[in-house]
C-alpha cells in the first residue's frame, strides 16, 4: 500500500495469521484477482462513514433520551462518554483498518491473532443488522407510497382496516381539554398496527406474509445492491447524494417545525435541565449506550471503511470531525422532533409527555399524527419519510459493504476474482431478504423487537469495546499503536486518547456493562406483551452469539496452536510481520525485543485459511 515501509529483518518474524499473497495465490490466479481498491478521495471516506453513523437513531432516539434524562443535564454524561469512549474507540477502529488495510476479522488477526474473535463477533452483529435494520426502510417506503393520496390514509376512521373502536381524538377535544376514551384507538395507531403490520396477538402466531411489505423490502434490497455492487468505486459516488440529502430534508423540517405554534414549549421540554436526574445511574447508562449505538462502534464497519484509506491519510482529524458532526446532527434533530411534538401537545391539549415517543413509535405514529394537523400534510409526510429512507439507506448499504469487505479479506483467493464480488453481494442480499420475510409477517414485529433489543444491544457493544481497547492498549501496546499512527499521519494524537485506551475507556465500559446486566429487564412489546420463555431464549441467543466469539476463539486458537503454553501464548499475541512498521523502527537501536516475540514454527500456526475459517 502507498507509503508502507518494509519490515527490517532485525529479529524473528512475528506470527502470520493471513497467508502471504505469494502463498495464497498461484501465478495463474493473480491476473484474475482484482485490486482491493481505495477511496478516490478523502470526501468519499468521510461521507461513507457519515452515512453509516448518522442514521435513524439520531432522529428518533437521541432527542427522546435528552427529554427523558433531564433535558440539557443529559449532555453532561453524554459528553463525558463522548470524549472518553466515543472518540477514542471510534478512532481506534478507523486507524486499525487504515493501518492493516483489512476488514474487521483479518485486521484483528494481524494485530493479535489470539483476539481474532473480536472481528468475528463484529461480523455476527453486522449480519444481524443486515437482516433487521432494512425492515425499517420497508415500513418507511410503505408510508411514503401511502402519502401520495388526496387524503392521508391515517387521518380518518373511514377505512376498511379501521375498527369500531377507532376515534379521531382531535374531533372530540375542546380548547385545551380532551375527553378520555379508555377503550378507543386513534386512526394513526390503527393504520400502523392493522394496515401496515397486521399485527397478531404474539410471537407464537406469525400469521401470513404482508405481501406489500415484502415488495417494499425487495425494493430496498435492490437499491442497496446497486449502491455497492461495484465496491468502493460505486459506494463512494452514491454517498455524495445519500449522505447529504437528509441534511436538506432536516433543514426544511427544522424551519417548518420551529414556526409551528407550540414549538417553543416543545423545545423547552427538550432542553430544560434537571440536574437531579444525574443521580440516577440509568441516565449514565443511557448516555453510554447511545454513544456506542450512534457511533457504530464494535460493528466492524469503521474498520472496513478505514481499510480503504490511503496509508498516510490523516484519519485522526477525520474521526474527530465525524464524531462532532454525528452529535451535532443528533442535537439539531432534537429541535425538529420536539418542535413538532410541542405543536402536537398544543393542538391536542395534552401534556407533552403524552405525545413524546422514541423509536418506531416516533417515526410511524407520532410524526404521521403530527402531519395530519399541518397544511399540505401530504408534502410534509413525503419529506419526512424520504428523509428517513435516506438516513436508513446509506447506513444499510454501508453495513452490507463492510460485511462483504470482511468476507473478501478472509477469502481473497476465492472472492477477489472477476464477478465474484457481485455474486457475493447478491448471495448476501438474497439470504437476508429471505430471512427478513419472517419479519414482514403479521407477527414479524415481535421478531424485529427481539433483534433490536438483543442482537445489537448496548450489552454486546460494551462487551466488545472492552476487549478492543484492552487488546490494543495492553496486549498489542498503546505506545506501539501510537508509533503506527504517527507513521501514518505524521504526528502523535492527543495524549488523552492513549490515556483513555489504557484506563478511562476500559473502566467506563466495564462499569456500564456490569450496571447494564444488573438493571436488565426482559423485553416487553409496547410495555405490555410478555414474550414466552422460548422467545427470550431466542433473544439471548442473538446477544450471546456475538459475545461468545471472543472467549471461544481464544480457547480454540490456544488449543490448535502447538507447543508449550507460554510459547503458544506468545506466538498468538505477536502481530503479523507483514504489517507496516515505523520508519525509525526500534530494532535499529537494538531494542527490537519489545516488539517481536520468538519466531513461530510454521506447524504451530493456525492462521491458514483451511484452519481458521471454521
From Swiss-Prot:
Cited function: Transporter that mediates cellular uptake of betaine and GABA in a sodium- and chloride-dependent process. May have a role in regulation of GABAergic transmission in the brain through the reuptake of GABA into presynaptic terminals, as well as in osmotic regulation. Probably also involved in renal and hepatic osmotic regulation.
Extracellular side: 138-210
Keyword check for Transferase: no
Membrane topology of this protein: Multi-pass membrane protein
Xref: InterPro entries: Na/ntran_symport (IPR000175), Na/ntran_symport_betaine (IPR002983), SNS_sf (IPR037272)
GN (gene name): SLC6A12
PANTHER family: SODIUM- AND CHLORIDE-DEPENDENT BETAINE TRANSPORTER (PTHR11616:SF118), SODIUM/CHLORIDE DEPENDENT TRANSPORTER (PTHR11616)
Pfam families noted in UniProt: SNF
Region described as Disordered: 576-614
Protein family according to the UniProt entry: Belongs to the sodium:neurotransmitter symporter (SNF) (TC 2.A.22) family. SLC6A12 subfamily.
Subcellular location: Basolateral cell membrane; Cell membrane
Tissue: Expressed in kidney, liver, heart, skeletal muscle, placenta, and a widespread distribution in the brain.
Identification of the protein by name: Sodium- and chloride-dependent betaine transporter
Glycosylation sites: 171, 183
Annotated keywords: Cell membrane, Disulfide bond, Glycoprotein, Membrane, Neurotransmitter transport, Symport, Transmembrane, Transmembrane helix, Transport
Domain of life: Eukaryota
CDD domains assigned to the protein according to its UniProt record, in alphabetical order: SLC6sbd_BGT1
Disulfide bond positions: 157-166
Gene source species: Homo sapiens
Reaction(s) the record says it catalyses: 4-aminobutanoate(out) + chloride(out) + 3 Na(+)(out) = 4-aminobutanoate(in) + chloride(in) + 3 Na(+)(in); glycine betaine(out) + 2 chloride(out) + 3 Na(+)(out) = glycine betaine(in) + 2 chloride(in) + 3 Na(+)(in)
Topological domain ranges for the Cytoplasmic compartment: 1-44, 557-614
Keyword Membrane carried by entry: yes
Location (main, coarse): membrane
The protein's assembly and partners: Interacts with LIN7C.
GO molecular function terms attached to this record: amino acid transmembrane transporter activity; gamma-aminobutyric acid:sodium:chloride symporter activity; monocarboxylic acid transmembrane transporter activity
GO cellular component: basolateral plasma membrane; cell projection; membrane; plasma membrane; presynapse
TM region(s), chain numbering: 45-65, 73-92, 117-137, 211-229, 238-255, 291-308, 320-341, 374-393, 423-441, 458-478, 499-518, 538-556
